[in-house]
């Protein structure tokens, strides 16, 4: 079993190249390869996570990462309690701190990495939405669909109250249509400029 002193910081943060051996001459699937995989599919990894990954094959490590429905009930309860406490303050910054805690402690890092990816893709602003509950609901929507069908995610996000507020759909009227919602959904989020 590897120890923390076995990890060389320089190679741990260098790009992993399949087929390359470790600088010390060990096999390809080692701590370096596992560290690369877990950084790419998550945010970081503990030594225990690295040891668990190298104890099996690369395919088994990937299968564990893709098992996004494997959140222990204790973690789900901890997050529910933290969310309720945060929502009680009404502070959107508290939600950001709560999410950071979740990212750092999640047993399913790929799910949070994909939630963050979709959060960046379907951008909204808490300053414009001005409702912590709506921002939380949007984050939960992104998490629910993070690893699923893009068309379903797009449909759900197009109905999301935070997104509707952010894209000015609340000011859209028959006599005075606001094209921002349709343009953003079509052009920025799915088809690209001029492809609709």
Description of each model-found segment:
Residues 1-94, 103-105, 109:
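N-terminal module-boundary/linker segments of secreted carbohydrate-active enzymes
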Residues 28, 45-63, 87-196:
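Primarily short, surface-exposed interaction patches in extracytoplasmic proteins
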């Amino acid at each position: 079993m590897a120890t923390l002193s076995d990890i060389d910081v320089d190679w741990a943060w260098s790009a992993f190249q399949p087929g390359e051996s470790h600088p010390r001459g060990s096999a390809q699937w080692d701590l370096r390869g596992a560290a690369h995989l877990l950084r790419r599919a998550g945010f970081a990894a503990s030594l225990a996570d690295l040891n668990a990954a190298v104890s099996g094959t690369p395919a088994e490590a990937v299968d564990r990462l893709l098992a996004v429905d494997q959140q222990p009930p204790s973690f789900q309860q901890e997050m529910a309690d933290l969310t309720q406490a945060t929502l009680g303050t009404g502070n959107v910054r508290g939600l950001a701190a709560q999410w950071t805690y979740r990212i750092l402690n999640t047993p399913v890092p790929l799910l949070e990495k994909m939630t963050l990816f979709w959060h960046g893709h379907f951008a909204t602003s808490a300053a414009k939405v001005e409702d912590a509950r709506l921002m939380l609901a949007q984050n939960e929507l992104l998490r629910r669909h993070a690893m699923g069908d893009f068309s379903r995610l797009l449909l759900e996000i197009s109905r999301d109250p935070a997104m509707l507020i952010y894209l000015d759909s609340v000011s859209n009227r028959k006599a005075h249509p606001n094209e921002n919602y349709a343009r953003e959904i079509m052009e920025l989020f799915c088809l690209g400029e001029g492809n609709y």
